[in-house]
Amino acid sequence: MSADRAILHSDMNAFYASVEMMLDPKLRGKAVAVCGSTENRHGIVLAKSELAKRAGVKTGMVNWEAKQRCKDLILVPPQYDQYLKYSKLAHEIYYRYTDLVEPFGMDECWLDVTGCEIYGKPLEIAEEIRQSVKEELGLTVSIGVSFNKIFAKLGSDLKKPDAITVITKQNFKENIWPLAASELLYVGSATTKKLASYGIKTIGDLAATEPSTLKYMFGINGLKLWRYANGTDESRVMQKDFVSPVKSIGHGITCTADLDNEEEVLHVLLELSQDVGHRLRVHGLAATGVQIFVRNKSLYSTQYQYKLPFKTQLPSEIAAAGFQLFKEHYIWTEKVRAVTIRAIDLIPQTTEEQLSLMVDYERRDRRVRLEDAIEDLRRRFGKKSLTYAGLLGNLKMPDDGRDSVKMPGLMYQ
């Protein structure tokens, strides 16, 4: 791999569950699931141990179904502060070799070790990292070693747990092309279904498809898919301090229990929009569009978007637009498992806008002053110092005190 880039992708195996078992020796060697609500039988499995996985427990299952699959399953509540702590400790190990470390969630990272021969060959560096994480943190990782980010990520998925997989220009067709197209990063259920309708079922099928056909199907993203499948992705691993240009701002969660009705969905959207509105203000941006992403209890995902008649930073307006989208499009055949709301088509807040006869600007000005005051109070006294009365009580959301890790936005669903 000396003539190529050397990219590693490190994935901490069954991360939440592994941290719990490392912290509590009584859990080791047992089937464990981390759940948003351990008391509620309709709580959701957020992560599971390897033994639980072998018994058929899946992330996103409700508690009672997981217990049916695995009678000896032990349910534990999440400790987000501990997960963040061990995520940061793993990152410190990665930084011993390179400052080109790009997080992909709390438990995954890309590392560019091109030109780092002083530490050994890429495979040797991967082996050192694997051993260091195990010895110093008591956790295991699977690492993919390849010449681009996409194949490195696939490599880390191929062997689990505690393993290393090398994908080269010489062997990727043999190892990668037979895999289902859905295994490719950023390809979700809707894209997989559309590809299948054209007879494209494997990554190899995707690689052999004419780029013009994929562009017709998915626009510019279709060409990216073709490059990913053919191993020609050249996207860089970003330096640890790199901040990408803000193209959209969103917030989403997997609920601790399934949402049963529109009122519960509205409350979740309003709570998520508080964070979105705050971050828009921090960046000095305003949204001219809103997008929502909804996953049902069968883990089928859909997304919808709407062009706003005005620019906004207001959480209430962002949530209202998202809720309108939900009411117009979501069919209640199943309960809702996860929700994301995103501010899109961003412009500088200082951008002049054309006035519309359809907007009550006097009412909007009052709302702006109110939410400015709320933002100021939260900045001075903390996020929980003031909230809407409708957001009190059980929102079926994870503990608000958790730390979150930024991730690249979903490209495909």
Question: What residues fall within each predicted segment?
Answer:
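DNA-contacting surface of Y-family translesion DNA polymerases
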Residues: H9, E183, T191-K335
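Gly/Gly-Pro- and Ser/Thr-rich, intrinsically disordered tail segments characteristic of DNA damage-repair
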Residues: M1-R227, V237-K240, H278, R364-Q413
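Short small-residue beta-strand/loop micro-motif enriched in glycine and branched aliphatics
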Residues: I74-L75, Y300-Y304, T351-E352
